[in-house]
Each structure stands twice: as structure tokens, then as C-alpha cells.
Amino acid sequence: MQYNFKVEAFEGPLDLLLHLIHRYEIDIYNIPVAEITEQYLSYVHTMKELQLDVASEYLVMAATLLQIKSKMLLPKHEEDVLDNGDDFIDDPRQELMERLIEYKKYKQVATELKEREQERAQLYTRPPIDFTSLQQEEETSLPLDVTLYDMLAAFQKLMRRKKAKKPVTTRITRQEIPIEQRMTDILKLLEIQGGRQSFYDLFVDDEREIMVVTFLAVLELMKNQQIVIEQEHNFDEIFVSSYTKSA
């Protein structure tokens, strides 16, 4: 089965690296290259396995990380270190670190500009505020913004869990299910469950092809703003809610 699925929200390899740095609380000035390379390659492999449209720059970054990793493994000769003991300039990670810091600044500025634009729009469009309900909203713990990279991590975890539960010998039967049909099934399930369901509970079938179709259906429903993905804290369980339920 071939599903060529393009997701515009994947912003590029630097965005993925920043996501990994944030997710695993890594110091951007002292990146553990071996660890970050392993995580990065795992994400790219999952994206390709799902037949998402992986841009060539992801593969270029993968090659760059592997090159940096190999340089980090080389023995460092004393003559390569500066006389003052500062070997920061010779650090193979230097260029990547500078690119990440620059990209992080760009993202922060873009986010601030977007927030200001939304605030200006609300000045002219929002109705009078009921301050009694506002106080209640402020006391409520808001869910985290769940990115597509978080969804990939959840799918990776799901695949590992399903693989561990599978018996040694399994009979494989191929079932071709259109993404549109699986989207309809998910929306019906949410309606039955009161508008909210655990992400993992959507994957009742252990067959890989059906799991892939289910995941792509979730992405398509997110893209169409028919469902909302919620997570209270980092690494917590992910829930899928119908858009009307979360509104």
C-alpha cells in the first residue's frame, strides 16, 4: 500500500532538532551529538515508514549529524587545541549550534509577531469580557501545544508497545483501508465516547498497515481542524478530542 502524504506543518530539520532539544531538556550549547543523532534518525525513519513527504534537507541534516558524530569520536591532538586552552572554536558542533540558536531566535520573533497580530485582531472583533469566567479560566491548567513531532514520538512508542506484545509467529493478512474511511471511523468513535478518546485506544488493530492508515487519518483530521490533540504535560498520555468538544 502506498500513501503519499504531505504535511505542511513539518518546518524542517532545524525545527525537529529544536523539538528534540526541548523535549529531552538538552543544553543547546553542549549538544550530546550521539544521542541527538540517534533520536533524529529515529524520527526520520518513522516519517519515511509512514510515507510522509520527507524533504531532502532532512536527509542532508542526517548526513551532517553523522559527520559531526564521527568527528567527535576522533582523538583530539594537543596541537589542535588553542594555546589558551579554549578549544570551543575547534568544536565540530559549533556551526550547528550557531544555526540552531539563530533559528530559535527567528521562531521566537515569529511567535511574538503572531501573538501581537492576534491581540490586535481581538481589539476589534471580540465581545465584552465576562471577568467572572476569565478568573476561572486562568486557574485552569491549559494543555500543551502538541506538535506533529510529538505525534510521531507517540506513534513510535505505540509501535514499540505493539511489537513487544506480538507473538513470535504471526499470520499477516493485508487489508487495504482508505484514509477517508478511517477518518470517518475515528469521528464516529469520538461521538460514541463523548467527544474524547485516548490516542493509543484508536489503534485496536495490531496490523502495521492499519496502524499507519489510522495515524495518517489522525493527521488529516488535525489538518482539517476536525479534531484537537491534547496533552497536559510533556510525556503524558495524548488524547484526541472532537473539535466541537474542545471548543
Curated annotation (Swiss-Prot):
One GO-annotated biological process of the protein: DNA replication
One GO cellular component term: cytoplasm
Record keywords, A-Z: Cell cycle, Cell division, Chromosome partition, Cytoplasm
Key word DNA-binding present: no
Subcellular location: Cytoplasm
Domain of life: Bacteria
Keyword flag Transcription: no
Pfam families registered for this protein in UniProt: SMC_ScpA (PF02616)
InterPro entries: ScpA, ScpA-like_C
NCBIfam families tied to this protein: PRK00104.1-1, PRK00104.1-4
Family of this protein: Belongs to the ScpA family.
Function: Participates in chromosomal partition during cell division. May act via the formation of a condensin-like complex containing Smc and ScpB that pull DNA away from mid-cell into both cell halves.
PANTHER family linked: SEGREGATION AND CONDENSATION PROTEIN A
Complex and partners: Component of a cohesin-like complex composed of ScpA, ScpB and the Smc homodimer, in which ScpA and ScpB bind to the head domain of Smc. The presence of the three proteins is required for the association of the complex with DNA.
Protein name as catalogued: Segregation and condensation protein A
Gene that this sequence comes from: scpA
